[in-house]
Amino acid sequence: MPVEKAASKQLVIASGRAHQPLAQEVAEILNTELVPVTAYDFANGETFVRYERSVRGVDAFIIQAHPAPINHWLMEQLLMVDAMKRASAKRITVVAPFFPYARQDKKHKGREPISARLVTDLFKAAGATRIMSVDLHTPQIQGFFDGPVDHLWALPLLADHIAATFGTENLTVVSPDSGRVRVADIWADRLGTPLAIVHKRRDPDRPNQVQVNEIVGGVAGRDCLLVDDMIDTGGTILAAAKALKANGAKR
């Protein structure tokens, strides 16, 4: 069948199936179209992808969201990168707004993998030359990839929206645990508000189990903004919200 040709060095955008409306909106903003991709799953769960036009010499951006089942969508993006490389794209940028396995960025105990590093290695092996992500769980993930990493922050847009919607006079930024203090502090500086911290303990042998110990900072009568980079089961945010209400937070 006939294959469309792509101009050399042309910027092209390809989308995985996890959340195609996101890639479509990006393409519309850039006044371009998505590269047509055929993708489907075999009966045993294997994924197949194929680009339906020439991508030789292009500057490609492969966009994939990573909701559940995350392993499925990660594998699809890896296959898309590999197919793009084998089709002679000049440069391939992986766009992963939520970076898969980002929370597994270090060993908590012996005999554990560093899964975030493995994911960056897989992208490199597949043919990626650059990675773009938003609000990485920890900044050191940028150093895992052997190539440029664009670490984007949603804070400027979100902070302006929060300030315009709720105001800042009665606002307190709250870190739901000690690991998010640095990010919450940046938010507090941006909004010009006080900072509070929820101290918690997490059992390393029981995933998603959270116990709140105490709150550092004044929250009574305040509008509290909880800042976190990832909500999975919602246990951390829910426990923090309950603790804030129990300590007199207004909303």
Regions inferred by a protein language model and the residue ranges of each:
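PRPP-associated nucleotide enzymes
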Residues: 1-251
